UniProtKB/Swiss-Prot annotation:
Keyword list, A-Z: Cell inner membrane, Cell membrane, Ion channel, Ion transport, Membrane, Metal-binding, Sodium, Transmembrane, Transmembrane helix, Transport
Family, as annotated: Belongs to the fluoride channel Fluc/FEX (TC 1.A.43) family.
Record protein name field: Fluoride-specific ion channel FluC
Topological type in the membrane: Multi-pass membrane protein
Originating organism: Azotobacter vinelandii (strain DJ / ATCC BAA-1303)
Protein's job: Fluoride-specific ion channel. Important for reducing fluoride concentration in the cell, thus reducing its toxicity.
Residues involved in Na(+) binding: 76, 79
Gene name linked to the record: fluC
């Protein structure tokens, strides 16, 4: 069990670092679009979780440490619902309600579509 715990910790650290780097890069290039980094990592994370889920269904022999490290660790560290919620609130507070609701809808629908697309990729 220590191997699984370590895999989740390492995966989480790597996912957090990638999210942090993505956020910094997008903020440096498009500071007015602060929410784009959260949207990007959440949609990418949904695509990856759909793909990994499909792969793990096809390959049940994949070790638990690898599955947990990638899904609970890496994708758990990469994606973030709390940042998504804060970004939406900031848009609403700044009087950008149409953008806030567009962001909300695209995040949810885009996330579902990306997860489905990731699962479909395993069948190609």
């Amino acid at each position: 069990m220590i191997g699984v715990t370590l895999a989740v910790a390492v995966g989480g650290a790597l996912g957090c670092l990638l999210r942090f780097a993505t956020s910094n890069w997008i903020s440096a290039h498009w500071p007015q679009h602060f929410y784009a980094a959260t949207l990007a990592v959440n949609i990418a994370g949904c695509l990856l979780i759909g793909y990994l889920y499909g792969q793990f269904l096809l390959r049940p022999e994949v070790p638990l440490a690898l599955r947990a490290g990638l899904i609970a660790g890496f994708l758990g560290g990469l994606t973030t619902f709390s940042s998504f919620s804060l970004d939406t609130l900031r848009l609403l507070e700044s009087g950008q309600a149409p953008l806030a609701f567009s962001y909300l809808a695209f995040s949810v629908l885009g996330g579902l579509l990306a997860t489905w697309a990731g699962l479909i990729l395993t069948k190609l």
